[in-house]
Amino acid sequence: MTSSVWQERRHGEDKQRRNDHRSPYQRDRARILHSAAFRRLQAKTQVLGVGMNDFYRTRLTHSLEVSQIGTGIAAQLRRKYPQHKQLLCSMSLLESLCLAHDIGHPPFGHGGEVALNYMMRDHGGFEGNGQTFRILSKLEPYTLDFGMNLCRRTMLGILKYPAPHSKLFVAGEHNEITNHRQLKPSQWPPVKGIFDDDNDIFAWVLEPLSEADRSRFTSTQQGSHPALHHYPHLRTQFKSFDCSIMELADDIAYAVHDLEDAIVMGIVTASQWHQDVAPTLTNSGDTWIRQELADIGNKLFSHEHHLRKDAIGTLVNGFVTAIVISEDDVFEEPLLRFNATLEPEFAIALNVLKQLVYKYVIRKPEIQMLEYKGQQIVMGLFEAFASDPERLLPLNTQERWRESEQQGLNSHRVLADYISGMTDEFAGRLYQQLFSPKAGSNVELSKEM
């Protein structure tokens, strides 16, 4: 691993700022933190819909917690594995990945993602992680054409699914819907990968890898998605070391902190915990889990807030300290050869918590109704803009659309870029202005998003 090649940026920079002694990864973190795309996460749905309650987490607070957990994982691994200090050379790098990991997710959570994927079904699809890659490398206006122009290693770390859409897509066996209201998310799952429109950037990121490493890293397999009964598409198999830490931090935050929101709001009950989670923890093959977590439900569902917070801290600490570094010696590049993984018994425990959130929170009819509503809003907006882009799109977006048309590129991607960047509230308001007679004649004039 030659650090210099992984610190390269796609567009060379010669900025000489007075007394600026920051590392390349500290600069990356600053660009992400100060970006408009990051700020908009404060008004995007995490699990519970924006506006339901002031307590729960948004995608912004979730990302901050993922960052805190990610650096905690790195600190633990530094102590456990001093021989891998070169791999764990920068906390700023891991903070960058964790802060940016959700930056491409559209309004209304999974509902918005499925809606955009359906509307883009003949134009390369849509998926939140692919959009994150695109925002960082192309869309965010830190530079004219290179997005935030982040370091190559940062871009490698954000690649949760390192293969293009065309390599992963498998056509599903379902009939074309005749009305948007009939769209079922289970029949239109997004392909987990990079958009083919961004293959040039993808190739640049992988440039330092040997041919063998590149081929294996981007290889695919048939596989199911944990949240879907039938996932028809192929799946990627590998991720980089940095990405593995970010993904574990994301999983822990999702399973533990989103569970906390659900408990506080009364969505998940103590009886559901004792039915769905407690037996797995009590019968765990790990002594610590049996001793420390078997009775943790009493604290989690306590009416005394400090006891619940203590239980949440115990859960997070348990998972963070159970992470180890595994090695796949087929890879030559250390960033691919090594991955952070959870010890098996803790992986089982984490999965049980994730399933609890999915079963009682995500699948809750009231939450699904919000997703469905968001789905309809996003499809309605896309259909309107696609019908007459030069009439309805904001002026700057019209210009991007025209350039795309003139260059023979995928102009529908411009529509997906615009809509996916909206917050829940902005998308809902725009939908009302377009389709509701009661919205009045005063259409909101706002600066380009």
UniProtKB/Swiss-Prot annotation:
<dbReference type="GO" id="GO:0008832">
    <property type="term" value="F:dGTPase activity"/>
</dbReference>
<dbReference type="InterPro" id="IPR026875">
    <property type="entry name" value="PHydrolase_assoc_dom"/>
</dbReference>
<dbReference type="InterPro" id="IPR023023">
    <property type="entry name" value="dNTPase_2"/>
</dbReference>
<feature type="compositionally biased region" description="Basic and acidic residues">
    <location>
        <begin position="7"/>
        <end position="27"/>
    </location>
</feature>
<comment type="similarity">
    <text>Belongs to the dGTPase family. Type 2 subfamily.</text>
</comment>
<dbReference type="GO" id="GO:0006203">
    <property type="term" value="P:dGTP catabolic process"/>
</dbReference>
<dbReference type="Pfam" id="PF01966">
    <property type="entry name" value="HD"/>
</dbReference>
<dbReference type="InterPro" id="IPR006674">
    <property type="entry name" value="HD_domain"/>
</dbReference>
<keyword id="KW-0378">Hydrolase</keyword>
<dbReference type="InterPro" id="IPR003607">
    <property type="entry name" value="HD/PDEase_dom"/>
</dbReference>
<dbReference type="InterPro" id="IPR006261">
    <property type="entry name" value="dGTPase"/>
</dbReference>
<feature type="domain" description="HD">
    <location>
        <begin position="59"/>
        <end position="255"/>
    </location>
</feature>
<dbReference type="Pfam" id="PF13286">
    <property type="entry name" value="HD_assoc"/>
</dbReference>
<dbReference type="InterPro" id="IPR050135">
    <property type="entry name" value="dGTPase-like"/>
</dbReference>
<feature type="region of interest" description="Disordered">
    <location>
        <begin position="1"/>
        <end position="27"/>
    </location>
</feature>
<protein>
    <recommendedName>
        <fullName>Deoxyguanosinetriphosphate triphosphohydrolase-like protein</fullName>
    </recommendedName>
</protein>
